[in-house]
């Protein structure tokens, strides 16, 4: 396959054309009055979205060089979404503005490497200033405001997320699912829940709900299979004397052991239930240890020289109640010591910070939530499947933005924070470095300009009004067309989202500006294959005689 090579200004201009097309499609979604984008799907109904990263992911351009430019900015949107969960449109608009302004200066003779150095210095200074302008999220109202802004001014979604975060805490897990009705719902699971149900329906105590309900049970934790009844007998005899229920959590329980437990349950000798341990391999061992710490018990493990026969009541955990259905087990109010649980939480947080695997990080965060607060499930309802998907995207964005706000704090929203931070930075650079710094400073108005433009206002007038004001909280409410104190109006953005959007935008724009050559595949126009020779088929008329 032949390759096509472009150099210098020609290469950068072709790359810019791809960035411009991507930006034009994404930028219309920005702000409270942003517009929808309709996306054709290979099958089914078209998708309607106001989510910047969803729009960006759908864009593939015919020209290979333009597609390379668009692809790099798509990566910015995707990376911003992965790290901050929101701010994808902001990052795209910033990257386009920086690249456009930088291209003009480099075409006029500026040194790309010096320009890049100035851009990096300016971005670092602005991020530091954003942190100075930020404030901590202090109450449920501010959480609701952040979520509402990120959900495209949907206050119902904002309130739902604030309720969920209040109930499970900042370390709790909040998941988003599709509801079976048109109503939004919030379900909160208190205590630790894991996805293992009862091993036999004969353990059920509440036939109406098809659940096992154990009050103040002992909890036996074993990391191997239990098949032999005699191994269990000593601990069962001790439990019978107490008159309390027993929950057994083990790798598996089968054969004679399970049959005998069921018989004892049916005869009323013991109030007992059994479930499989959650997870697999090393993760199973870690989760059993989590349950042990939460309930104040110990894992009976042959690796530690313990056998099931040696288990005593002091090895067993306890909880105020346990509820088991066919799919899940929930342990409420474990009897573990708070200091031990806190130490375990610190240990898991350290593992989250160290791991590089997204899958491992997700599983560790689930374990952290189960230990620290619980799990909230937001069920999103809508009249049609298309509306459901669009709404679910907005809830996911709002949830990520809220977590980012709790993590690093908030600044004024609507693109005004960038302008206020930029006004406070004066690096006193010279030469082409100063040009690079000025490129970033100019680009900082782009998000506010776009928000104003989408709302039908004069972008230049709005940007100038915010720039000249000395009030750090002064900004433009695009929903009403008024200039307001942004904190008081509840128009706020997470610092983390602004920081990551700017970092990623400067990073990709500087890469594009320092590109001196591009290599892409040359599409060759292949001639249509010739039609086969049909001349020999003339005699087929005589085939009628075959009848």
From Swiss-Prot:
GO BP field: protein refolding
Major localization class: cytoplasm
Keywords: ATP-binding, Chaperone, Cytoplasm, Isomerase, Nucleotide-binding
GO CC annotation, single: cytoplasm
Residues that, per the record, bind ATP: 29-32, 50, 86-90, 414, 477-479, 493
UniProt cross-references to SUPFAM superfamilies, sorted A to Z: GroEL apical domain-like, GroEL equatorial domain-like, GroEL-intermediate domain like
Function: Together with its co-chaperonin GroES, plays an essential role in assisting protein folding. The GroEL-GroES system forms a nano-cage that allows encapsulation of the non-native substrate proteins and provides a physical environment optimized to promote and accelerate protein folding.
Subunit structure: Forms a cylinder of 14 subunits composed of two heptameric rings stacked back-to-back. Interacts with the co-chaperonin GroES.
Protein name per UniProt: Chaperonin GroEL
Organism of provenance: Campylobacter rectus (Wolinella recta)
